[in-house]
């Protein structure tokens, strides 16, 4: 039946089903195989770590992208025989992809339109893939998110057809050396080979205010990724007079009417900041001319990563970018959660339009883990959700399994808290949250520095077992996968007031990530909205939703 659908209907279905279902369709019949294969190869996300499906929406990210599919290997588990490491498995899967292209290059390579790289892809395999694409990839238009110059070298034969350009850095990580003339010559050659009239996205690791001094008319790009590096701020060979540099702004280089997406990523360490006498970290905003972006009124997506927080800069961005729909704030150092910031955002024009918000901030809560050396310290559950589910988790999991030696919530040895601190273990030590880039509409979730929840459970139980004093012959029960999910849900309930600020202030918000925890904002009824987790969602019930009844129902 599926293979008999008109192509236009088939096409609409294909764009709405995840990769797993697309693969299943290849086995239905020959016509179905031939119809679905272009949708599998059109947009490729080349990952070097395992992909994770969400249980709230298992299609998240893979309706648009196709990923390299492989599982996580728990290399530290002595009970499991592992024939290879995660890194080795990733290379093998990547090489299988290369082999598949090599077997049918004329049929498969022309199907590829977009490739998203990740930084640590095996360089040798990537070189071979690019050789195939340079010869047969006639429809390849977009290749992005890479930092190695070798990728640009492989893409040179396709320069005129590409709509993306990455001006890679002189070295992977910033150094204290000045930029060499040979590096600048390479960048010059890249730019000369590129058709700037076709360019839609530019990623640059060099000071644009100095490098692009003779571009002529502004580039009509849609997306700009600006990397701030201490080693590419000053370009001696491109320096002009001070008077000229003061006049040059980003609006002279990029067309303000076309730029829609702006990502600013700082590579500065604390040691690289200007001294207090020179203006401190605020001086970086001035040196890179970032205030010049306030003249770009059509920005719809703004990402600020690894910068030091500047209230002045952010507030002006929110006030000027009336069309802002996507916002990411991931600052270096201290950035406290501030209700006044969200209130300010809600009063701006963009506050009514914002759909996706990713924020990393300090919530300044200590939960029940005491910050004291007092040998007799009581566990404190004040502020926790009073619902029956949370009460059950506290009594059946926390008190009976994690702190079985406590009496009346009294702790005997605070020095061993870190092994018992399941929140720290869950979100920092053995993270269960995959990296979910909600500001990219269709980006799949990846387990960069996270582990499956089963691995977290094993490691937490091992840490717990090694620290529990069992002098009273107390039965030590290991936590289970279900217990771990209950602890995660307990934490989400604890954040009720934080979620409520966003839910009530930003009426069109669809996705919200707080400190790496991705959620979907759903409309419960005509009056209420709530955040639900994208991962480990099964069994979750929001504690911010109330049953609404009318007078008739109340007294019937």
Swiss-Prot record:
This is F-box protein YDR131C. Interacts with SKP1. Component of the probable SCF(YDR131C) complex containing CDC53, SKP1, RBX1 and YDR131C. Its main location: other. One of its GO terms (molecular function) is ubiquitin protein ligase binding. The lineage of its organism: Eukaryota, Fungi, Dikarya, Ascomycota, Saccharomycotina. It comes from the Eukaryota. InterPro entries: F-box_dom (IPR001810). The keyword Cell inner membrane does not apply.
